[in-house]
Amino acid sequence: MPDAAAVARDAAEAESAFAHPPVEPDLTWAYGDHPDQIVDFYAPRGPERESVPLVVVFHGGAWRAPYDRRHISPFADFLARRGFAVASVEYRRGRDIPQPRARADTAAPVAGRWPETFDDVAAAMDGLPVAVARLLPGADLRRTVLTGHSAGGHLALWAAARHVLPRGSAWRTETPANLRGVVALAPLADLARAAELGVCGGAVRQLLGGEAEFAARCASADPALLLPTGIATVVVQGQEDIVVPPAVADSYAEAAAKAGESVGLTLLPEVGHFPLIDPAADACAVAVEEIAQLAW
């Protein structure tokens, strides 16, 4: 269990990250009929360029319904103010019908929908090239970087690994996505390890439909099992993170190494979970620099 000082640090960091008001997008595109099947677009700010990289953002929140893309909109705007075109992806979370909880006494909302959460990420990624060309004409799709925070980091890694999904998967693509790379921020990158650690109150098992389905579905959902991807990947992790402990990132990097792939792992001392998406924090600038290194 984290000590009192760690809990206090986490609370202060969360308060700072969520103190920024939501930033309205320039445009919103619907990739499906459900209200959550939308992508917010932020046009690049600052000096006009003929073309700029595209950053696709997946928000976190343990795949739970109360936490949507609005909480990461200040981060999306931060990217736009640094000259990137940004696509912030919403996706279905939680459930409208009961789903088994990790513990009978938990008060947390149920996490994720199987298969809808993954359906949505795949559909958004498949539709983005045409939508971006129409709505963000200055965005250079050849310089696309995926990023995501926490549960969104898991989705970013998964979206980049669809070409190594098991054959027969409805989400599998025959060729890799045209990406410069992925920068995953405190990601739930190894679902099995995260489940062992009880990260986010059982959310990992709930995402895949509960304990009975977990092991079988990991083969189609766990980035640590979808390796190597052949796509440049960087994980940025706060060493003091008590929400998604560094052990999860370490486990993913080890799995990549065993698969013959090198994953960049940037460990930030005295940083917890939320500064990575807090425009007021130095850690956020580090995260954006990692994105820039791949994109430019």
Can you annotate each of these PLM segments?
Residues 242-251:
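Conserved alpha/beta-hydrolase "acid-adjacent" motif
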Residues 66-76, 87-142, 279:
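Catalytic nucleophile-loop/oxyanion-hole region of alpha/beta-hydrolase
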Residues 235-237, 241:
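Short beta-strand/loop motif that positions the catalytic acidic residue
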Residues 2-48:
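N-terminal cap/lid segment of alpha/beta-hydrolase-fold proteins
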Residues 16-18, 24, 192-225:
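Mobile cap/lid helix-loop segments that gate and shape the active-site cleft of serine hydrolases
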Residues 45-51, 55-78:
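Short, surface-exposed "cap/lid" segments of acyl-processing enzymes
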Residues 126-197:
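Primarily recognizes the serine-hydrolase "nucleophile elbow" in alpha/beta-hydrolase
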Residues 236, 250-296:
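C-terminal catalytic histidine-bearing segment of alpha/beta-hydrolase fold enzymes
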